[in-house]
Curated annotation (Swiss-Prot):
Its cofactor is FMN. The gene is OPR1. It comes from Oryza sativa subsp. japonica (Rice). This is 12-oxophytodienoate reductase 1. Belongs to the NADH:flavin oxidoreductase/NADH oxidase family. FMN binds at P35, L36, T37, A68, Q110, R234, G305, G326, R327. One of its GO terms (biological process) is jasmonic acid biosynthetic process. The lineage of its organism: Eukaryota, Viridiplantae, Streptophyta, Embryophyta, Tracheophyta. Probably involved in the biosynthesis or metabolism of oxylipin signaling molecules. In vitro, reduces cis(-)-12-oxophytodienoic acid (cis(-)-OPDA) and to cis(-)-OPC-8:0.
Length: 380
């Protein structure tokens, strides 16, 4: 018992809970809510229950990244995902952003276009999804079949870039502190960047520079619209998802980081780790992001299934400035507090990740205090 106070004091000083200055934004800790698709925005309009969900996970000086949000009607690939392209959607986001800001947290919106990761059911007038290619995604083990995409014409690409620009502007109008461009996980930007998907012969295909041209032009447009200090990007050069991989991920990641550095003050680069290896029953971080971390001038956020111990280590080692948590934060709304106390974590229920219920698996994960109160009642 005499050692308990020392343990609490040590826990308060863990690397994940040290303050950090991201550009001009002051963070009180380094535990970031990763963007998580939750499929609960009925009719593509954010709902009041999202204000409960996000404010539960908000702490003073914490950073939350909202779920991937459609930039246009053609951007959708999953049911009930939110948009940011109509005035109704902008107005619906405002009270959600306000709820997070009342907690003193910072809130960024991830903006995306899924490209070919869609079906005609989600597309306007039942049209084919658009992509860099007309190659269809190979059905996965779940049996999900995505529709054959239509290859974007060269003269159509500026419109998609402008959709990203307007989405960023709309996000700022809704009150968000900034935006994260979704350039990861096999969605539209990666369908251009990665050579397994991009088979174009125009200026957006072929060489690495050409394949990255679309993503770079999106970045340029968004930065010009809202300022580099309000823009981050998520990249996953090593990830093979949705039939989207690259023959030289290090070259791809390095090239993209170099393009980010051309914008002075570009806020952050959020990268996803290669798969973690299992060695002697424990996960081992591949540390594959180190070259990009060294090259990038701004804040570097790492993601990829980290736990408390791994997150503390990468911050202490200078491998990352911030660590994004997805499933752990989904299931533990008070995750920074639990990390501080090294408290037990709620287990997540995968079966409720993408259901449309506004409470179950969404806002009903208990806080530590609720568990403690239940224990006291049980043993009283």
């Amino acid at each position: 018992m005499v050692h308990a106070p020392a343990k609490v004091a040590a826990a308060a000083a863990i690397p994940l809970l040290t303050p950090y200055k991201m550009g001009q934004l002051e963070l009180s800790h380094r535990v970031v809510l990763a963007p998580l698709t939750r499929c609960r925005s009925y009719g593509n309009v954010p709902q009041p229950h999202a204000a409960v969900y996000y404010s539960q996970r908000a702490t003073r000086g914490g950073l939350l990244i909202a779920e991937a949000t459609d930039i246009s009607p053609t951007a959708q690939g999953y049911p009930e995902t939110p948009g940011i392209y109509t005035q109704q959607q902008i107005e619906a986001w405002k009270p959600i952003v306000d709820a997070v800001h009342r907690k003193g947290a910072l809130f960024f919106l991830q903006i995306w276009h899924v490209g070919r990761v869609s079906t005609t059911d989600f597309q306007p007038n039942g049209q084919a999804p658009i992509s860099s290619t007309d190659k269809q995604i190979t059905p996965d083990d779940s049996g999900m079949v995505y529709s054959k995409p239509r290859r974007l014409r060269t003269d159509e690409i500026p419109q998609i870039i402008d959709d990203f620009r307007r989405a960023a502007r709309n996000a700022i109008e809704a009150g968000f502190d900034g935006v994260e461009i979704h350039g990861a996980h096999g969605y539209l930007l990666e369908q251009f960047m990665k050579d397994s998907a991009n088979d174009r012969t125009d200026e957006y295909g072929g060489s690495l520079e050409n394949r990255c041209r679309f993503a770079v032009e999106v970045i340029d447009a968004v930065v010009a619209e809202v300022g580099a200090h309000r823009v981050g990007i998520r990249l996953s050069p090593f990830v093979d998802f949705m039939d989207c991989f690259d023959s030289d991920p290090v070259a791809l990641g390095s090239y993209m980081v170099q393009q980010l550095n051309k914008h002075p003050g570009f806020l952050y680069c959020h990268m996803v780790e290669p798969r973690m290896a299992i060695i002697e029953g424990r996960r081992k971080i591949a540390h594959g992001l180190l070259p990009f971390r060294k090259q990038f001038n701004g804040t570097f956020i790492a993601a990829g299934g980290y736990d408390r111990e791994e997150g503390n280590k990468v911050v202490a080692d200078g491998y990352a400035d911030l660590v994004a948590y997805g499933r752990l934060f989904l299931a533990n709304p008070d995750l920074p507090r639990r990390f501080e106390l090294d408290a037990p974590l709620n287990r997540y229920d995968r079966s409720t990740f993408y259901t449309q219920d506004p409470v179950v698996g969404y806002t009903d994960y208990p806080f530590l205090e609720e568990i403690d109160e239940e224990s006291r009642t049980t043993y009283a």
